[in-house]
């Protein structure tokens, strides 16, 4: 075959094809989540400059808040304390870039604020679509996050559990 080293027809026995510089210390979650958070923050910063109907702006703003909340939740779920980023970062933002991580409770409270905004403002646009985000998807995501965080708080933090369980939409 063309590249026998790439299939199981020829086993590589030496380390010549191994480059230690290419091995990641993590699976890339940290970078990927903050990349999506950055995109959401850029959208939120510049969407008012775009000429489009108010309903569409509201929808895309809600979508950005939903994504930002979800990505912060993914970081908290995997790493615990993390940085809350709610603006487009520059090199001048040293306190965020090199500062201490924020407590998971603080971050999750802000995640809940983002999710509440998304649920309140997403509307029924695309409600009949099976491929587009709508208020029902936002509620389902909010439910999943609140139930996870409530359960985590009950068994690990011994606080805040009731708050998240009460905020979870009960019909999802």
Show the residue positions of the predicted features.
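Short coil/turn linking the two alpha-helices of tandem helical-hairpin repeats
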Residues: 76-77, 83, 126, 148-157
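Short, flexible, mixed-charge acidic loops at enzyme active sites
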Residues: 81-90
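Conserved, well-structured interaction surfaces
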Residues: 3-79, 95-109, 113-130
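Amphipathic alpha-helical protein-interaction segments enriched in hydrophobic
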Residues: 131-141
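TPR/Sel1-like alpha-solenoid repeat signature
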Residues: 65, 139-145
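Acidic, serine/threonine/proline-rich low-complexity intrinsically disordered regions
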Residues: 88-89, 140, 153-166
């Amino acid at each position: 075959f063309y590249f026998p080293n790439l299939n199981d027809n020829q086993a590589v026995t030496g380390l010549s094809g191994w480059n230690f510089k290419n091995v990641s210390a993590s699976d890339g979650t940290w970078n990927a989540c903050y990349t999506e958070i950055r995109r959401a923050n850029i959208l939120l910063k510049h969407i008012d400059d775009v000429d489009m109907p108010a309903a569409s702006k509201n929808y895309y703003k809600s979508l950005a808040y939903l994504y930002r909340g979800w990505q912060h939740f993914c970081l908290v779920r995997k790493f615990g304390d993390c940085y809350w980023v709610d603006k487009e970062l520059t090199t001048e933002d040293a306190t965020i870039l090199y500062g201490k991580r924020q407590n998971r409770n603080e971050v999750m409270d802000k995640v809940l604020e983002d999710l509440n905004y998304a649920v309140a403002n997403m509307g029924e646009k695309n409600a009949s679509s099976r491929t587009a985000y709508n208020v029902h998807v936002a509620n389902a995501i909010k439910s999943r996050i609140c139930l996870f965080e409530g359960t985590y708080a009950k068994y690990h933090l011994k606080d805040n559990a009731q708050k998240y369980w009460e905020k979870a939409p009960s019909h999802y």
